[in-house]
Amino acid sequence: KNNRNDIVRRLYRKPNKGLIGVDISSTSVKVLELSMKSGRYWVESYALVPLPEGSVVEKNILNPEAVGDALARAINLANTQSNQAAFAIPTSMAITKTIEMDADMTSDEREVQIREDAEQYIPFPLDEASLDFEVLPDRLTNPNRVNVLLVATRLENIESRCEVIELAGLTPK
């Protein structure tokens, strides 16, 4: 199990030193610490720790404590300096849709519009969804329009991964 001193050490790491990427599969937890130097990303450390069988089944976390323990071991193996972690959501758990929007909208206006229109793109209730979007760099024939990538997943997919990250003494970002 987790050593209490290791958890305390992770809690007091410098919060913005870098970012830890976390990938949870059915067989392992992988971590990769990135930092920014001279405008470029650098891999500072990485590790892979196997998971006990049955901890993650069909991409669903069934045993958060076991996965959190494996993540904590991976963090210790990688000797990361950050306490902030971002995680991947399996593509099978995400819904993506490219939508065309006015180019002159602010980010806040775009978010309001996406939330108003999201029900037509997402096959589950919005109060059960986590949404994100990104303006794509590709140019459309109409310079007044942009393509926006909308990504949605069920909140439970986010919450289960946040729980694992917090169990390992990290802060989800």
Report residues per predicted region:
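Short, flexible, glycine/charge-rich loop motifs used to bind or transfer phosphoryl groups or to couple energy/partner
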Residues: R9-R10, I75-N76, D138-R139
